[in-house]
Amino acid sequence: MCAGFYVAVHPWLEAQSLHKVGHTGNLAARLHDGSYTTCFTDEWKYCFTLETSTKKDAQKIEAGVLYCAQFFRVKNKELVCLLPEKIKQLAEDVANCLDISYTLCDSPTYEMNDSTIVVEPSLPSDPLISKEKLRHLVITPVEDEEHFADDVLFFSTDETRTAIEDRLYQKEAANMGYQELRRSGRAILQMACRCGKTRVAYLILSNYLQGKVLYLVPGLSLLRQTLEKLYQYGISLKNVLLVGSDQTRIVLNHDNIEMTTNPVFIAKRIREAPSLLVIATYQSSTLLVDDFDLIISDECHRICGEWETRPFTHVLLNFKKGHRLFLTATPRYDTPLSMKNRELFGGVAFRYYLREGIEAGYVNDFELQMVAAPKLAHQPSNREETTKQIIVKQIIMALAYLKTNIPAPKMLVFTRDIKQARELYAELVDQGVYALIAHSTLPRQVILKTFTEFCSSKEPVILLNCRLFQEGVEVPELNAVFFAAPRHSPRDIIQSICRPLNKQVQKPHATIFLPLEVNTENVCLDRFSSIIPFADALASEDPRFYEHLLNPSEVAYPINWIGAHGSVSELLQLARHAIRYGTQGKIDRLTRSERLPWKAAFAELKRTVEICCRYPKINDGFHFGGATLRFDTWYKWVIKSYLQYKNKEPSSLEPYQVSDLESLQDWTTRGVGGPYPWEESMAFLETWLAQNKGELVAIDIHQGGWIGLDATPMERLSGVLTTVSQRDGRSYGKNKKLRPKKGFMIPPQQAEDLDRIFGKHNLKWRKDRVNGFLKEDEHGNYTGEPTCIQEAYRTFKEYVKTNPEYIEKYWPGYAKGKHKHQELPHIWESGLAPPRYKAFKDGNKQLIQRSPKKKDIKN
């Protein structure tokens, strides 16, 4: 008898890419016992075995393999969805880690006779194995397939060192990222695909090269690519350590370097080296020790997921030292462990939109083509078959559209799952379409061969996949992507869109195809529900698309419809309506304050501050993408979020937005506190009364606020007392004869301040009341004794005529017209002031451009 660990396969399981792992004390008899022959035919065979001296050793290997392949195991079964070569390597690694001697046998056959049929003694179901020893062997889940692609597809770039000129936004990103690291120890750089995040990371890590830097990447190919780029930028290989499972030597110019997974060597090198750059895969991060000054996590959205320790979260959750820099184009916020966690990830220190990269010429532009559902000659008997035939025809329509402009177009088709990819592939091939298919259950050599064939094809070709080529794979000649199934994750959508956006000389714009089950015979908003997540994701990366959705007549966008049976313009209008208002068509989803593109809204705020010398007023309007918006609503949201951020509360603002705000003149005083600072004005009032023997002298409370950033203390006091007078002029209680009013609205603390300051000088500031109501005549005119504030205004009106020196000193440039209180005269005259927002009873909203009257212009 021969004991051992085995991997067996049966045709029924092999069709699903499943393999049976197990252990036995009798390899010759195992595949002939009842558990194998009762439910299956006798077509079992061993892929390989590890013969061991005892059954207990074989059981330990099985337990170790199932632990390390836990993410690929069928629940409660000893079935693993991995290629035999991968399981073989894993089994040998487990045996070596557990110090178990074995003999490897590939595709063995064992002779079966009566002497081999022996009843095996039972063993404990859960053998004791050191999971700590095996933790570094745990295989990362392939739930999104792109991790698989990282290790399969790698195309070397030119590794020669060349002078590189940093782009302006890269310098800005590096500066803001480094400053945020110094301030809080953590920073996120959110930059669109293909905009040079690695270069920015290099500029930042250059500040830490006297110490130890860890650069984490999600796969072996990206590790090589990162090394090559850093080498081009000037990094010396003598201070570089590569941690990964590929033993192939990497040759760069005349230098060369190898990867390692030796935990003893890795720990010793990290601890003893005074300065070191470690580039490692997340999968190998459990081999590292916590001794770094800076940790860079590339494609950090892949860290997010369940709140548990796994290779991708190991460093994030267990390492305590060093600053943390996170790089991504698509942050992930929809998981238990998400990038909303400021303690772990920090905030976004720099943001660079996809549209910015396109307009700057670094990213290829693209168009959107929605593909209508074609009419079928024969209606299938079930819904699933109908959908499949419709999508096949839509793919063929999309390819035909590409061929009108490109001789040999290449199109990636993203499917819902591998099953759908196989079904579509079979249908397309049957219809004579040159189609290829790749998925993670295929051998690596097959995937690489398929991908190479796709890239080098001189004919129109389609490559079907689920998520294998969604991230990290460069296809310079790719012309289009087609979504054969809805995507709901913004990360998946943006990453997929970016696949064909490589910038190349004379390369035509890319095309994004969105199939819809819509035609003119049966149109309703629900038919557009599948594109709403897509539109939301794109609008967050492309402000131009956002503006187009608000008003397509003012902002053009390359979006069209192919295969429509009726009016294209009407279908596009319905699609835009569904995106903006949802399939119920009720709530405007786009004009919420938090959804306004930050750079555009902040630019208007900055313009108002720098040109108009003030912050927004309540009735300021904002013209964006043809939409009429109330700017004050967004401004109040900004102030609220800013205060939450400064108080270390959950906030919608990111560090780069806070930095923008704090760059504005007097932001923390006038921007946040408003034009009428209460405490500052009360201190000025108290000093004034003390110096002038209790005489308030002259205050203008009639024309409204003094809101300019250059306002004098007396002008600001006028604004404060104007507000006091207005609020004190409101009755409280119920009175049927008068229109209901809001009541006595001066806050108690402010009333106490006024009582204290005016009381010292026996000045009356409150209006007279009877039973809580103002003393008024039948016309609503106040009939009580004048307050000191009202008397001060009468004095002011006299001073305007008789005391110009006083007016010029405390109200410099004062004009009779009210425009002085709102804008500087030249701003008013030139029409640079923000337009006035007005909402009418019928729901209509307008922006009314402020224009001066002749009497408002001071000669």
UniProtKB/Swiss-Prot annotation:
Enzyme Commission numbers on file: 3.6.4.-
Coiled coil: none
Keyword flag Zinc: no
Record keyword ATP-binding present: yes
SMART domains hit by this protein: DEXDc
Primary enzyme class: hydrolase
SUPFAM superfamilies found in the cross-reference section: P-loop containing nucleoside triphosphate hydrolases
Any one GO molecular-function label of the UniProt entry: DNA binding
Organism of derivation: African swine fever virus (strain Badajoz 1971 Vero-adapted)
Descriptive protein name: Probable helicase A859L
Binding site for ATP: M191, A192, C193, R194, C195, G196, K197, T198
Helicase C-terminal domain location: 394-553
Superkingdom, natural source: Viruses
